[in-house]
Regions:
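Buried hydrophobic core positions in alpha-solenoid tandem helical repeats
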Residues: 107-110, 137-141, 166-170, 197-198
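Hydrophobic core positions within HEAT/HEAT-like alpha-solenoid repeats
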Residues: 122-125, 141, 154, 168, ...
Length: 263
Protein backbone atom coordinates (compact mmCIF):
# COMPACT_ATOMS: atom_id res chain seq x y z
CA UNK A 1 0.00 0.00 0.00
CA UNK A 2 1.24 3.45 -0.83
CA UNK A 3 1.29 5.65 2.25
CA UNK A 4 2.39 8.82 0.51
CA UNK A 5 1.25 11.84 2.49
CA UNK A 6 0.47 13.72 -0.70
CA UNK A 7 -3.22 14.58 -0.81
CA UNK A 8 -5.23 13.42 -3.78
CA UNK A 9 -7.60 16.37 -3.45
CA UNK A 10 -7.06 19.93 -2.31
CA UNK A 11 -10.50 20.28 -0.78
CA UNK A 12 -10.06 17.66 1.94
CA UNK A 13 -10.72 18.95 5.47
CA UNK A 14 -7.91 19.12 7.99
CA UNK A 15 -6.97 15.83 9.58
CA UNK A 16 -8.47 14.84 12.90
CA UNK A 17 -4.94 14.90 14.33
CA UNK A 18 -4.57 18.57 13.35
CA UNK A 19 -8.06 19.25 14.70
CA UNK A 20 -7.13 17.66 18.04
CA UNK A 21 -3.90 19.67 18.19
CA UNK A 22 -5.79 22.94 17.76
CA UNK A 23 -8.34 22.07 20.44
CA UNK A 24 -5.64 20.90 22.84
CA UNK A 25 -3.97 24.31 22.64
CA UNK A 26 -7.26 25.86 23.77
CA UNK A 27 -7.95 23.29 26.53
CA UNK A 28 -4.58 21.82 27.52
CA UNK A 29 -5.42 20.33 30.92
CA UNK A 30 -9.03 19.13 30.80
CA UNK A 31 -11.20 16.91 28.59
CA UNK A 32 -12.10 18.66 25.35
CA UNK A 33 -15.57 20.24 25.28
CA UNK A 34 -18.04 17.94 23.52
CA UNK A 35 -15.28 15.39 23.01
CA UNK A 36 -13.81 17.45 20.20
CA UNK A 37 -17.03 17.80 18.19
CA UNK A 38 -17.85 19.10 15.68
CA UNK A 39 -15.21 17.45 13.52
CA UNK A 40 -14.00 19.15 10.32
CA UNK A 41 -15.49 16.24 8.35
CA UNK A 42 -18.66 14.78 9.81
CA UNK A 43 -18.05 11.60 7.83
CA UNK A 44 -21.73 11.21 7.10
CA UNK A 45 -24.08 8.90 8.94
CA UNK A 46 -23.40 5.35 9.92
CA UNK A 47 -23.33 3.05 6.87
CA UNK A 48 -26.61 1.20 6.53
CA UNK A 49 -25.65 -2.45 6.95
CA UNK A 50 -28.00 -4.94 8.65
CA UNK A 51 -26.61 -6.31 11.92
CA UNK A 52 -26.32 -9.86 10.61
CA UNK A 53 -24.29 -8.65 7.62
CA UNK A 54 -22.02 -6.21 9.46
CA UNK A 55 -19.23 -8.56 10.52
CA UNK A 56 -18.98 -10.38 7.15
CA UNK A 57 -18.98 -7.01 5.34
CA UNK A 58 -16.32 -5.63 7.65
CA UNK A 59 -14.18 -8.75 7.34
CA UNK A 60 -14.38 -8.74 3.55
CA UNK A 61 -13.55 -5.04 3.31
CA UNK A 62 -10.59 -5.31 5.67
CA UNK A 63 -9.23 -8.31 3.80
CA UNK A 64 -9.36 -6.24 0.63
CA UNK A 65 -7.42 -3.49 2.38
CA UNK A 66 -4.76 -5.88 3.68
CA UNK A 67 -4.45 -7.56 0.28
CA UNK A 68 -4.13 -4.36 -1.81
CA UNK A 69 -0.45 -3.37 -1.77
CA UNK A 70 -0.83 -0.85 -4.59
CA UNK A 71 -3.83 1.00 -3.17
CA UNK A 72 -3.11 4.76 -2.94
CA UNK A 73 -3.23 6.12 0.58
CA UNK A 74 -6.30 8.30 0.17
CA UNK A 75 -8.22 5.55 -1.64
CA UNK A 76 -7.44 3.33 1.33
CA UNK A 77 -8.57 6.05 3.72
CA UNK A 78 -11.87 6.51 1.91
CA UNK A 79 -12.48 2.77 1.88
CA UNK A 80 -11.93 2.65 5.65
CA UNK A 81 -14.20 5.67 6.11
CA UNK A 82 -17.10 3.71 4.61
CA UNK A 83 -16.73 0.68 6.87
CA UNK A 84 -19.77 -0.10 9.08
CA UNK A 85 -17.87 0.29 12.36
CA UNK A 86 -17.55 2.20 15.59
CA UNK A 87 -14.62 2.25 18.08
CA UNK A 88 -16.06 -0.83 19.79
CA UNK A 89 -15.21 -2.91 16.73
CA UNK A 90 -11.45 -2.82 17.38
CA UNK A 91 -11.28 -6.52 18.27
CA UNK A 92 -13.02 -7.48 15.04
CA UNK A 93 -10.59 -5.35 13.07
CA UNK A 94 -7.63 -7.04 14.73
CA UNK A 95 -9.09 -10.49 14.02
CA UNK A 96 -8.58 -9.85 10.32
CA UNK A 97 -4.91 -8.92 10.78
CA UNK A 98 -3.75 -10.47 14.08
CA UNK A 99 -0.10 -10.15 13.05
CA UNK A 100 0.04 -7.12 10.75
CA UNK A 101 3.07 -6.70 8.53
CA UNK A 102 5.38 -3.76 9.08
CA UNK A 103 3.85 -2.23 5.95
CA UNK A 104 0.34 -2.52 7.39
CA UNK A 105 1.51 -0.98 10.67
CA UNK A 106 2.87 1.97 8.66
CA UNK A 107 -0.51 2.27 6.98
CA UNK A 108 -2.19 2.27 10.40
CA UNK A 109 0.18 4.99 11.59
CA UNK A 110 -0.59 7.05 8.48
CA UNK A 111 -4.35 6.71 9.00
CA UNK A 112 -4.08 7.93 12.59
CA UNK A 113 -1.97 10.94 11.68
CA UNK A 114 -3.67 11.92 8.42
CA UNK A 115 -7.22 10.61 8.57
CA UNK A 116 -10.04 13.10 8.18
CA UNK A 117 -12.81 10.56 8.90
CA UNK A 118 -13.12 9.03 12.36
CA UNK A 119 -13.80 5.54 11.02
CA UNK A 120 -10.51 5.57 9.11
CA UNK A 121 -8.69 6.74 12.24
CA UNK A 122 -10.43 3.99 14.22
CA UNK A 123 -9.07 1.37 11.81
CA UNK A 124 -5.59 2.83 12.19
CA UNK A 125 -5.72 2.85 15.99
CA UNK A 126 -7.10 -0.68 16.12
CA UNK A 127 -4.24 -2.02 14.00
CA UNK A 128 -1.58 0.04 15.77
CA UNK A 129 -2.38 -1.28 19.27
CA UNK A 130 0.29 -3.75 20.29
CA UNK A 131 2.62 -2.59 17.52
CA UNK A 132 3.10 1.07 18.43
CA UNK A 133 6.56 2.37 19.31
CA UNK A 134 8.01 5.27 21.27
CA UNK A 135 7.82 7.45 18.16
CA UNK A 136 4.04 6.99 18.20
CA UNK A 137 3.58 8.42 21.69
CA UNK A 138 3.01 12.08 20.60
CA UNK A 139 0.61 10.92 17.88
CA UNK A 140 -1.44 8.80 20.30
CA UNK A 141 -1.54 11.46 23.01
CA UNK A 142 -2.94 14.03 20.60
CA UNK A 143 -5.49 11.88 18.76
CA UNK A 144 -6.58 10.41 22.11
CA UNK A 145 -7.84 13.84 23.14
CA UNK A 146 -10.83 13.23 20.85
CA UNK A 147 -13.47 11.25 22.73
CA UNK A 148 -14.03 8.62 20.05
CA UNK A 149 -10.31 7.76 20.14
CA UNK A 150 -9.49 7.95 23.86
CA UNK A 151 -9.94 4.27 24.74
CA UNK A 152 -8.07 3.01 21.68
CA UNK A 153 -5.23 5.50 22.14
CA UNK A 154 -4.87 4.52 25.80
CA UNK A 155 -4.86 0.85 24.85
CA UNK A 156 -2.03 1.47 22.39
CA UNK A 157 -0.07 3.63 24.84
CA UNK A 158 -0.25 1.08 27.66
CA UNK A 159 1.58 -1.41 25.44
CA UNK A 160 4.54 0.88 24.72
CA UNK A 161 7.41 0.29 27.17
CA UNK A 162 8.33 3.47 29.01
CA UNK A 163 5.11 5.33 28.14
CA UNK A 164 3.51 5.01 31.59
CA UNK A 165 3.59 8.74 32.36
CA UNK A 166 2.08 9.42 28.94
CA UNK A 167 -0.74 7.01 29.74
CA UNK A 168 -1.46 8.97 32.93
CA UNK A 169 -1.24 12.27 31.05
CA UNK A 170 -3.90 11.20 28.56
CA UNK A 171 -6.13 9.51 31.15
CA UNK A 172 -6.28 12.73 33.17
CA UNK A 173 -7.43 14.64 30.08
CA UNK A 174 -10.02 12.13 28.92
CA UNK A 175 -13.57 11.35 30.01
CA UNK A 176 -13.78 10.17 33.59
CA UNK A 177 -14.28 6.46 32.99
CA UNK A 178 -11.36 6.30 30.57
CA UNK A 179 -9.12 6.32 33.62
CA UNK A 180 -9.91 2.63 34.14
CA UNK A 181 -8.29 1.87 30.77
CA UNK A 182 -5.09 3.27 32.22
CA UNK A 183 -5.36 1.99 35.79
CA UNK A 184 -5.69 -1.72 35.08
CA UNK A 185 -2.49 -2.14 33.02
CA UNK A 186 -0.54 0.00 35.51
CA UNK A 187 -1.46 -1.89 38.70
CA UNK A 188 1.74 -3.94 38.65
CA UNK A 189 4.06 -1.05 37.83
CA UNK A 190 6.81 -0.61 40.43
CA UNK A 191 7.30 3.16 40.11
CA UNK A 192 6.15 4.75 43.42
CA UNK A 193 4.62 7.75 41.66
CA UNK A 194 2.61 5.57 39.30
CA UNK A 195 1.51 3.29 42.14
CA UNK A 196 0.30 6.32 44.09
CA UNK A 197 -1.71 7.44 41.07
CA UNK A 198 -3.29 4.00 40.72
CA UNK A 199 -4.26 3.93 44.42
CA UNK A 200 -5.82 7.38 43.99
CA UNK A 201 -8.42 6.15 41.50
CA UNK A 202 -11.73 7.86 42.41
CA UNK A 203 -13.98 5.55 44.40
CA UNK A 204 -16.90 5.96 42.02
CA UNK A 205 -14.79 4.25 39.34
CA UNK A 206 -13.68 1.35 41.52
CA UNK A 207 -15.52 -1.94 41.61
CA UNK A 208 -14.92 -3.93 44.79
CA UNK A 209 -12.81 -6.54 43.00
CA UNK A 210 -10.62 -3.92 41.33
CA UNK A 211 -10.07 -2.18 44.67
CA UNK A 212 -9.08 -5.52 46.21
CA UNK A 213 -6.70 -6.25 43.32
CA UNK A 214 -4.97 -2.89 43.76
CA UNK A 215 -4.76 -3.27 47.55
CA UNK A 216 -3.20 -6.71 47.40
CA UNK A 217 -0.88 -5.97 44.47
CA UNK A 218 0.45 -2.90 46.30
CA UNK A 219 0.78 -4.59 49.69
CA UNK A 220 -1.51 -2.06 51.35
CA UNK A 221 -1.17 -3.55 54.84
CA UNK A 222 2.61 -3.50 54.62
CA UNK A 223 2.59 0.09 53.40
CA UNK A 224 0.49 1.18 56.37
CA UNK A 225 2.63 -0.70 58.87
CA UNK A 226 5.72 1.20 57.76
CA UNK A 227 6.82 4.56 59.07
CA UNK A 228 6.03 7.26 58.34
CA UNK A 229 2.59 7.08 56.71
CA UNK A 230 1.56 10.34 55.12
CA UNK A 231 -1.96 11.71 54.74
CA UNK A 232 -2.10 10.84 51.05
CA UNK A 233 -1.53 7.15 51.74
CA UNK A 234 -4.17 7.12 54.51
CA UNK A 235 -6.62 8.69 52.06
CA UNK A 236 -5.77 6.11 49.40
CA UNK A 237 -6.17 3.25 51.88
CA UNK A 238 -9.53 4.52 53.08
CA UNK A 239 -10.70 4.97 49.51
CA UNK A 240 -9.75 1.40 48.58
CA UNK A 241 -11.27 -0.13 51.72
CA UNK A 242 -14.56 1.69 51.21
CA UNK A 243 -14.61 0.60 47.57
CA UNK A 244 -14.14 -3.03 48.67
CA UNK A 245 -17.37 -2.78 50.69
CA UNK A 246 -19.31 -1.90 47.55
CA UNK A 247 -21.73 -4.43 46.07
CA UNK A 248 -21.84 -2.68 42.71
CA UNK A 249 -20.48 -5.81 41.03
CA UNK A 250 -22.96 -7.92 43.08
CA UNK A 251 -20.58 -8.84 45.90
CA UNK A 252 -18.44 -7.13 48.47
CA UNK A 253 -14.74 -8.01 48.49
CA UNK A 254 -13.82 -6.64 51.91
CA UNK A 255 -14.31 -10.05 53.57
CA UNK A 256 -11.99 -11.72 51.06
CA UNK A 257 -9.22 -9.13 51.13
CA UNK A 258 -6.01 -10.47 52.64
CA UNK A 259 -5.20 -7.06 54.10
CA UNK A 260 -8.48 -6.43 55.94
CA UNK A 261 -7.46 -7.48 59.47
CA UNK A 262 -4.01 -5.90 59.40
CA UNK A 263 -5.40 -2.64 58.08
Amino acid sequence: MSVSSERSALDRPVSLFEHAQRLHRLTPDDPLPDGGHPFPDSGGGRPEVPDEERKPALTAALRDIVASPSLPAWDLHDLCARLPINPGYAAWIREVAPEPSSQLVEVARWLVGNGTAWRAVTVGLSLLAGHAEQRDVPLLKVIGRLRFADHLALEALTQIPGAEQDVIWLAERSRHRSRLRAVKPLIGNRDPVIRGWVRSTPRELLSSDLARTISEAHGLAELLSGQPVDDALWDQAGNLLLAMTSTRNYRSEIGRASCRERV
